[in-house]
Structures are given as C-alpha cells and as structure tokens.
Amino acid sequence: MLTYKTFKILGREILIGVVWEEKIQGIAYSLDGLEFLKDQLSRVTSHLKSRGVKVNLLEEKSRYPDLVFDVLKGKIGNEKGFEELSLEGLTRFEIKVYSWLVKNVKRGEVITYGKVAKALKTSPIAVGGAMKRNPYPIIVPCHRVVGKNNPWLYTPKPSYKKFLLEVEGWIS
C-alpha cells in the first residue's frame, strides 16, 4: 500500500510517502512537491523489488506518514519508529548498520562514516553504501552520518540533509 501526506515544519512543506504492508517497507520525502516525491518513491520501490520485496502501490490511508513526521519532530524516538519497519529485503549488514545508528546517534547529533565504520569494524565506504541504500530515511537517520571533509555525501539533495539537521537543531 502507499500513503502520502503533506506537513509543515520550519515554515516549509514536507511531503512524506510511505510504502507499507503489515509494516513500513519504504519511506520517501520531498521538499520540492509531489513530482519529486513520486520520483523518490519510484526509486525506493524499484530498490525493494530488486531485493525480492513484493510491493503494492494501491493508495490507502494509514498512520505511517504521521509516525514518520512524529520521528522528524522528535515527538517519538527513532528506536520506536524502527519497531514499525519491515526490514524486508535488507542484508544482515544493512540491518546491523541501521540498528546501530538508530540506537547510538541521537537527535541533534552527527557522526562521521569513519566513526560508524570503526564502531562496526567495517569500512567507511561500506557504511556509506548502506546509507545510500537506506529505504527508511528519517526513521533510520542517515542524515546524521556525515563525511569527515564533506558532510553532504550520499544524499540525493544536500539541501534535504541540511534541512533535516536543521529541524533536529544541529544546524541553526
């Protein structure tokens, strides 16, 4: 199923789209209107399908966009949101990275790819790849992972990463 909804925060509109069945299969968001959201949802669903996840894009109401927005606002924590994710189609490594990130990097904090890699005994490039493939942005806060020399790596739009960090109070 697919549900999307428009919200306002910091004087801007954010559209949040969620693909779901029993639990959340994928999330996309847009600060640039419905067409960009549809492009992002297409990217997420293609990725899920390539991993063998059955996706139904029939539009139906659900509470999931509100849940994602509540995580963004800090009304509920990322760990609570993480419980609502299906984790279908993820590798063991991706689950390990996403779980660690949700538990260890809190709202308003950032961490480098290198530090995540060190904590998980892997390479920064492997961590970056997992962040790039993250089908659950906002709940799995890949925006909190930054490059040592370039904080805006692995994001479709650097302005989006900046916006999420601004909402969380890291950038003022």
Swiss-Prot record:
Q: Which Pfam family, giving just one, matches this sequence?
A: DNA_binding_1
Q: Which GO terms fall under molecular function for this chain's record?
A: methylated-DNA-[protein]-cysteine S-methyltransferase activity
Superkingdom, natural source: Archaea
Mainly resides where? cytoplasm
Sorted keywords for this record are: Cytoplasm, DNA damage, DNA repair, Methyltransferase, Transferase
Q: Which reaction does it catalyse?
A: a 6-O-methyl-2'-deoxyguanosine in DNA + L-cysteinyl-[protein] = S-methyl-L-cysteinyl-[protein] + a 2'-deoxyguanosine in DNA; a 4-O-methyl-thymidine in DNA + L-cysteinyl-[protein] = a thymidine in DNA + S-methyl-L-cysteinyl-[protein]
InterPro entries cross-referenced by the UniProt entry: DNA_protcyst_Mta_Thcoc (IPR054936), MethylDNA_cys_MeTrfase_AS (IPR001497), MethylDNA_cys_MeTrfase_DNA-bd (IPR014048), MethylDNA_cys_MeTrfase_DNAb (IPR036217), MGMT_N (IPR015236), MGMT_N_sf (IPR036631), WH-like_DNA-bd_sf (IPR036388)
Its subcellular locations are: Cytoplasm
Q: What class of enzyme is it?
A: transferase
Query: What biological-process GO terms show up in the record?
Result: DNA repair; methylation
Miscellaneous note of the record = This enzyme catalyzes only one turnover and therefore is not strictly catalytic. According to one definition, an enzyme is a biocatalyst that acts repeatedly and over many reaction cycles.
Any idea what job this protein has? Involved in the cellular defense against the biological effects of O6-methylguanine (O6-MeG) and O4-methylthymine (O4-MeT) in DNA. Repairs the methylated nucleobase in DNA by stoichiometrically transferring the methyl group to a cysteine residue in the enzyme. This is a suicide reaction: the enzyme is irreversibly inactivated.
Q: Family membership, please give it.
A: Belongs to the MGMT family.
Protein's name according to its UniProt entry = Methylated-DNA--protein-cysteine methyltransferase
Q: From what organism does this protein derive? A: Pyrococcus horikoshii (strain ATCC 700860 / DSM 12428 / JCM 9974 / NBRC 100139 / OT-3)
